[in-house]
């Protein structure tokens, strides 16, 4: 929603776990117990939203053995903004790109691909840096900034930083771009050009503004105590160019990038099309009592009030 200059005012969370009542001793080697994952994920998710001041009005966790191998975490938000405050224009040569928000670190390097890799007992030692470190207060400041119509009307186009970092968030804004990675604010020294370009550190936004609007935009960012620096310019030549440490380390034609790489074809076989919904149950007068007890013992029918009250549903 922030990319669309909207203010987020409502959220929901749907998750999936295995049997959280299973004995700790039955946990697979190299894995965390389901109850630990379920509780920790809920506390982390709710902490972020509660600090921002975001009302989370629907929270539900489903339980199924299939979620042991791959836990489900689904989040969605609703945002809105006055139509006149949302400007959508095509960037032109000479326009500048401002990076605002959090600083860039090694956290999140490879996160987009890492989330789909096979996890092993060594993953906790080798894949920790793929996880981004959130900063809810920084995100709240950006939300406050984007509620200001005088700010959002200066923005021609914007992107938030997700998978791919600078490569994607800035790389998608225009066909021709010249990016100076040395100007990207860092959490600490020692990052090379590749790490700066692909880091998925959170709470960052990239916006396109006219050169004459840079000072006004940066001044508004400073009022909210948000770092904002010019890191790129839009160019006439349709190439994605990145400079670091006095050298050009990337120079790719847009027409090549637009091919989206090698096409992958995968065969798939649907094996469960006739499986009935878990909620669909049949009973009879003879088995009604036993069937009722079975339903009541199912985790999917148990009260989730304890989980739901972790999330603030009235703030905002």
Can you describe what each PLM-predicted range is?
Residues 1-316:
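Glycine/proline-enriched, intrinsically flexible loops and inter-domain linkers
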């Amino acid at each position: 929603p922030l990319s669309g200059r909207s203010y987020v005012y409502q959220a929901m969370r749907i998750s999936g776990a295995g049997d959280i009542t299973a004995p700790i001793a039955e946990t697979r080697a190299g894995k965390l117990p389901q109850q630990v994952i379920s509780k920790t994920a809920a506390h982390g998710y709710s902490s972020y939203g509660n600090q921002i001041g975001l009302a989370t009005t629907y929270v539900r966790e489903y339980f199924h053995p299939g979620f042991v191998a791959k836990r489900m975490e689904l989040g969605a938000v609703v945002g809105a903004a006055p139509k006149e405050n949302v400007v959508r224009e095509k960037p032109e040569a000479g326009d500048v790109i401002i990076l605002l928000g959090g600083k860039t670190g090694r956290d999140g390097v490879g996160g987009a691909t890492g989330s789909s890799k096979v996890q092993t007992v060594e993953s906790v030692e080798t894949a920790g840096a793929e996880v981004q470190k959130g900063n809810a207060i920084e995100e709240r400041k950006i939300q406050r900034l984007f509620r200001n119509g005088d700010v959002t009307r200066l923005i021609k186009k914007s992107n938030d930083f997700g998978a791919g970092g600078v490569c994607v968030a800035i790389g998608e804004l225009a066909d021709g771009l010249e990016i100076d990675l040395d100007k990207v604010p860092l959490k600490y020294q020692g990052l090379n050009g590749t790490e700066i370009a692909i880091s998925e550190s959170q709470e960052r936004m990239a916006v396109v503004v006219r050169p004459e609007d840079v000072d006004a935009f940066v001044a508004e960012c400073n009022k909210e105590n948000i770092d904002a620096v010019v890191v790129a310019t839009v160019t006439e030549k349709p190439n994605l160019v990145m400079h670091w440490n006095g050298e050009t380390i990337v120079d790719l034609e847009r027409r090549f990038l637009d091919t989206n790489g090698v096409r992958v074809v995968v065969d798939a076989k649907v094996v469960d099309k006739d499986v009935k919904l878990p909620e669909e149950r049949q009973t009879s007068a003879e088995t009604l009592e036993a069937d009722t007890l079975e339903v009541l013992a199912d985790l999917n029918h148990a009260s989730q009030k304890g989980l739901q009250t972790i999330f603030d549903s009235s703030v905002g």
